[in-house]
From Swiss-Prot:
Subunit record text: Component of the RIX1 complex, composed of IPI1, RIX1/IPI2 and IPI3 in a 1:2:2 stoichiometry. The complex interacts (via RIX1) with MDN1 (via its hexameric AAA ATPase ring) and the pre-60S ribosome particles.
Pfam entry (one): Ipi1_N
A single GO molecular function term of this UniProt record: chromatin binding
GO CC annotations on file: cytosol; nucleoplasm; nucleus; rixosome complex
Record-given protein name: Pre-rRNA-processing protein IPI1
GO biological process, one term: pre-replicative complex assembly involved in nuclear cell cycle DNA replication
Organism domain of life: Eukaryota
Keywords assigned by UniProt, alphabetized: Nucleus, Ribosome biogenesis, rRNA processing
Subcellular location: Nucleus
Region annotation Disordered: where it falls in the sequence: 1-25
Function: Component of the RIX1 complex required for processing of ITS2 sequences from 35S pre-rRNA.
InterPro entries linked to this entry: ARM-type_fold, Ipi1_N
């Protein structure tokens, strides 16, 4: 026992250096006094560079979730150049799925580059915007109710971008949701909403500090109402009348060609109009035709706009000009429904 104890103590004793002799090497030291002409890496798989544009794009899509806003911004700038080459390929699906959530990005410059990217996608192929209408509506609604005031104020710009390229699909798919979201962004409480006065105060304060962004959201609201409440143009109807004999044998242009049969739609009773029902019950209402959209707008949203717009007209400026045009649009919609 005494011998083992002595050996253990020697392990922790520091050996004294002797004069003229070098320091003793450690027991686990690695000898590096050799020269190698080649180094072999057994796990190396990539030996040559690739020029595949789609493969490079897929690698860059993962950077959309990078923690650095500069990296996310530069990735979106690169995608703007690459979109015309890959918009009709399989990578377009992953591109849209990776970029659309950036509508709620906290950085302003990232949102600006995403807006440019969506504009490029719509210019190259508007059908891609129509195909991804559901996630676009989902994240636009999330941006309109976001806790960040900057994300809320920029939601109107994304709405205008989608209106330019797939406006008719947007008004049919999310008429009530977009109107409710825009009123929330502008700070206008709605009657019958679950949280009518919950977030109105903060939105009003933030909007008054950013008159230019308020002007953009008012313009987005005007464009959305004008497109949703207008009847189809006479020229478009005349163009559809010529191939009426064989049109029923072709692929439909609208997403729900048999909606007029109302097979999966809950109809309201004849004595209960859509405008008379609470606002939170209109989420299940199908707004495929302009008449239904006008009834919903006149019953739930027109009184709110008519009460809020005159004060903006008195303030003048760009907001006052858009507010005056909105008041004229309200009268036009009222006359069209009469």
């Amino acid at each position: 026992m005494a011998k083992k104890k002595t050996l253990k103590q020697q392990d922790f004793q520091k050996k004294k250096l002797k004069v003229g002799k070098p320091k003793q090497a450690a027991s686990n030291a690695t000898d590096t006094s050799f020269v190698a002409k080649t180094i072999h890496l057994p796990n190396q798989t990539k030996l040559t560079s690739t020029n595949d544009a789609e493969a490079d794009l897929l690698r860059r899509l993962s950077l959309c979730k990078h923690h650095s806003e500069i990296t996310r911004k530069e990735t979106l700038i690169y995608l703007q150049v690459a979109v015309p080459r890959v918009i009709h390929g399989q990578v377009a699906s992953r591109l849209m799925s990776a970029c659309i959530p950036l509508m709620c990005d906290p950085n302003k410059h990232v949102r600006e580059e995403l807006l440019k990217l969506l504009d490029v996608v719509g210019s190259c192929d508007a059908n891609t915007m129509r195909l991804y209408m559901r996630p676009l509506v989902l994240f636009m609604g999330s941006a309109m109710t976001h806790i960040s005031a900057g994300v809320q104020r920029d939601s109107g710009r994304f709405l205008q971008c989608v209106l330019r390229h797939a406006g008719h699909e947007l008004v049919r798919a999310a008429w009530v949701k977009m109107l409710r979201g825009l009123c929330n962004v502008l700070g206008w409480p709605l009657r019958g909403a679950a949280s009518a006065s919950a977030g109105a105060g903060s939105n009003v304060v933030s909007m008054h500090k950013n008159r230019a962004l308020q002007h953009q959201n008012l313009q987005a609201l005007a464009d959305f109402i004008r497109l949703g409440c207008a009847e189809p143009a006479a020229a478009a109807l005349a163009g559809c009348a010529a191939p009426a004999l064989y049109a029923k044998y072709l692929l439909p242009d609208c997403p729900q060609p048999y909606s007029h049969l109302k097979l999966f739609v809950r109809e309201f009773p004849a004595d209960t109009a859509a405008a008379a029902r609470p606002l939170h019950e209109l989420d299940t209402l199908v707004c495929e035709d302009a008449a239904t959209r006008r009834d919903v707008f006149l019953g739930h949203f027109r009184p709110v706009l008519a009460a809020q717009l005159p004060s903006l007209v008195k303030d003048g400026g760009d907001c006052g000009r858009v507010a005056a045009n909105l008041l004229q649009l309200l009268d036009h919609v009222q006359q069209a429904a009469a």
